[in-house]
Amino acid sequence: VKLSKELSLEKELIFLKNIDSDLKVALIANANLFLMPSRIEKKSVEGFGISFVEAASYGIASIGGKDGGASDAIINNKTGLICDGKDLNSIYDSVIDFFQNDNFINYGKYAKKFSENFHWDLIIKNYLKLIN
């Protein structure tokens, strides 16, 4: 919120919290981009990028930070982009690249296909193979 004020973007951005799942799905499904530039903050970081997989399941490609689980859920330059979440120029450049030449359309198609690797039935099947 503080950064949005510093950049005079308060009218361009909406910050939501505690939203229900129907609204979350509607917002994701109508997006062109899922952006979460994760970064390590006081040794705390997202372990796996389930949010990226969720967006991908709707055909929405992502830009994620190089720290944390984004690299497990995003194939750089195929299902989205990985950037330096601590560097505003890196984030900016990634957003510009994302929309250049309609890259986001192709990224979204690949992201949707890639998200199928994370369906629970497939994960359970693979775990059963490991223990048998």
Language-model segments: which ranges?
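A short, well-ordered alpha-helix in the C-terminal region of glycosyltransferases
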Residues: 90, 97, 103-117, 126-129
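Nucleotide-sugar-dependent
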Residues: 39-49, 53, 71-72
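C-terminal alpha-helical cap of glycosyltransferases
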Residues: 1, 120-132
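Conserved acidic donor-binding segment of nucleotide-sugar-dependent glycosyltransferases
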Residues: 76-77, 81-88, 96-102
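Short alpha-helical donor nucleotide-sugar binding micro-motif in glycosyltransferases
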Residues: 18-19, 26-31, 127
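Short hydrophobic beta-strand element within catalytic cores of glycosyltransferases
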Residues: 52, 57, 61-64, 74
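Nucleotide-activated donor-binding/catalytic signature segment of Leloir-type glycosyltransferases, i.e.
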Residues: 1-23
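Acidic donor-binding loop of glycosyltransferase active sites
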Residues: 29-44, 60
